[in-house]
């Protein structure tokens, strides 16, 4: 999403006509395979999309990027990309992606619903105007809850998270390719 926002700004400036955006993550290097609450949720992936200026009212109409660094404890990687071991040589049980799922779910649903409404308002559109929503593929339950909050239902939402898991920066390019 952040990459799309940056590319959108470059294209609107008129200095660029065509830009390749690549999103790739190897989350399998960051999961603790002994932690079944997180390791099954994430996947590796890469995707790319070429965006270009075109006349008319098609394409990316608006972007809104928000973040809240104070919520970092809801989802973070405690020790980086390398496994850590205790003094006995055992794998550190706190290694890898750490997530507070129920809390993260509530925050994500509220934030994605609100930012989607803001983006639509910025363009003078309503949720009913959405023909197809391609959200970040974080979690099926989050995507379903956001679709419900927007009143669009899943028939207007593209979803592939059940096949690939959360591929982080690659999720939207992969979904757009499909």
Which residues does each predicted region cover?
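Claisen-condensing/thiolase-fold acyl-transfer catalytic domains that form or cleave C-C bonds
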Residues: 1-12, 109, 113, 120, ...
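Condensing-enzyme catalytic core mediating Claisen C-C bond formation in acyl metabolism
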Residues: 35-106, 110, 114
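Beta-strand segments within the central parallel beta-sheet cores of soluble alpha/beta enzyme folds
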Residues: 16-24, 61-63, 128-134, 155-160
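Acidic-glycine-rich active-site phosphate/pyrophosphate-binding loop
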Residues: 21-27, 82-89, 142-154
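Flexible, glycine-rich active-site loops centered on histidine and acidic residues
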Residues: 10-46
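Short, well-ordered secondary-structure micro-motifs
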Residues: 31-32, 73-75, 145-146
């Amino acid at each position: 999403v952040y990459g799309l926002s940056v590319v959108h700004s470059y294209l609107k400036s008129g200095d660029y006509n065509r830009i390749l955006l690549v999103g790739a993550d190897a989350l399998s290097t960051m999961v603790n395979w002994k932690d079944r609450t997180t390791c099954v949720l994430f996947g590796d992936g890469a995707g790319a999309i070429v965006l270009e200026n075109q006349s008319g009212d098609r394409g990316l109409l608006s972007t809104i990027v928000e973040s809240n660094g104070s919520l970092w404890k809801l989802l973070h990687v405690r020790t980086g990309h390398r496994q850590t071991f205790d003094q006995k040589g055992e794998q550190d049980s706190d290694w890898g992606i750490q997530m507070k799922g129920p809390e993260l779910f509530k925050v994500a649903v509220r934030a994605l619903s609100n930012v989607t409404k803001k983006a639509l308002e910025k363009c003078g559109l309503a949720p009913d105007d959405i023909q197809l929503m391609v959200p970040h593929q974080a979690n099926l339950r989050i995507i379903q809850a956001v679709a419900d909050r927007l009143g669009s239902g899943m028939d207007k939402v593209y979803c592939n998270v059940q096949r690939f898991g959360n591929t982080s920066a690659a999720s939207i390019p992969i979904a757009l390719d499909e």
